Amino acid sequence: MRFANVTIVLFLLLAVIGAIAGFIGGRIYKKSRMRARMPKHRGLKIEVLARDFTVCKVTDYSGVDLTERFCFVGKTDEENSLVCETSRVPSNTTVREDGWRALRIAGTLDFSLVGILADLSAVLAREKIGIFAVSTYNTDYILLKKDRLEDAVRALEAAGYTVV
């Protein structure tokens, strides 16, 4: 009888140890898989532009100086939009929203790259940071409200991006 009790206790002990080892091993495996799935573009350098921007609607583009360093124009059948430095907002602006800062993905992006903006916006969305994205031929820009800039930088760095 005694031998049977010892056998049962040993069996239960081994089962518990096996369950603990399986749990720990599973967590390690899951973490390594998560790291392996991290997007390859993490590690890209993100530049913080040292100027304030305004997003606005204009009646037409006659007052827009296209020789300025930063000037993003969007024209549709419904509106004429403009993103420019706050100090350069034209007088024929009908609606404007000030207080934006910009992040630029450094370098020239290849058109075959997929998911860069999606990943950046997902990182910022988890922190409840709204964005306004603008793309050029070479790269992408993310505008965000300047009171959330520090939060955005922290979140992007924690996600593996280099922010300068």
Q: Where are the predicted features?
A:
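Feature marks short, highly hydrophobic, charge-poor N-terminal signal-anchor/signal peptide-like helices
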Residues: M1-L14
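Short, flexible segments with low predicted structural confidence
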Residues: V6, V95-E97, E127-K128
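Terminal signal-anchor or tail-anchor transmembrane helices
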Residues: F11-G25
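Regulatory modules associated with amino-acid/nitrogen control
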Residues: A21-V123, D151-V164
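A structural feature that tracks compact, well-ordered secondary-structure segments
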Residues: T108, S112-D147
